[in-house]
Regions:
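Nucleotide donor/acceptor-binding cores
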Residues: 1, 83, 167-169
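Terminal peptide-recognition signature
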Residues: 3, 34, 154
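Short polar catalytic/cofactor-binding loops
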Residues: 7-11, 37-39
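Short glycine/threonine/proline-enriched tight-turn/helix- or strand-capping micro-motif at secondary-structure
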Residues: 12-21
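Glycine-rich beta-strand-centered segment in the early N-terminal region that forms part
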Residues: 21-38, 50-100, 136-139
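NAD(P)H dinucleotide-binding glycine-rich loop of Rossmann-like/cofactor-binding domains
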Residues: 91-169
Length: 169
């Protein structure tokens, strides 16, 4: 597949279009056909490099992903192949005490797509099924890609933390 990668930290001249292996998914993972990936400030920081933080190279940037599920390996997910999704870019273990109370970002194993893990500046992105959020056709992929960080933050607070249920306001 084609992807925009960096081989070292630096300016925009370090962004390179390259052929890279298509990700292979395991149980409870999905392969998302990336339709749009917004530029997030985190992508710039990652490209430029941050003192004390090592990023695996070569690296695919892009944390704000919108796309369509191309392949999914899950027996319990309601999301199926062809579903339009945005991706919650923060990946946690799901089993530690912080994850159990909804504080995923405090997980010792917390990673972000496009930062510690390969992201969405590619034709496909490998994503945990639990990080997929199905979205409507009301907006374009480009519009959805512009809002994962804000959308996911608001969704997390309403659904996970406040436990808002259908019909409640």
């Amino acid at each position: 597949m084609r992807a925009i990668i960096i081989k070292k930290h630096g300016g925009t001249d370090e962004l390179t279009l390259a052929d890279v292996p298509k990700p292979q998914i395991s149980s409870e993972e999905a392969l998302v056909k990336v339709k749009a990936c917004a530029l997030n400030r985190l992508d710039i920081w990652t490209r430029q490099g941050m003192p004390g933080i090592k990023i695996p190279m070569p690296h695919i940037l892009g944390c704000d992903i919108a796309g369509e599920v191309a392949e999914i390996k899950s027996s319990s997910s309601k999301i199926k192949e062809g579903t339009k999704v945005v991706v919650s870019p923060g990946i946690s273990c799901g089993i530690c005490e912080f994850c159990k109370i909804g504080w995923d970002s405090l997980c010792d194993q917390y990673q972000i797509l496009g930062f510690q893990l390969d992201g969405g500046y590619a034709e496909f992105a490998k994503v945990p099924v639990k990080n997929l959020i199905s979205v409507s056709n009301r907006y374009s992929f480009e519009e959805w890609a512009a809002c994962p960080l804000v959308y996911v933050t608001a969704w997390h607070m309403l659904v996970t933390r406040a436990e808002l249920k259908k019909g409640e306001t």
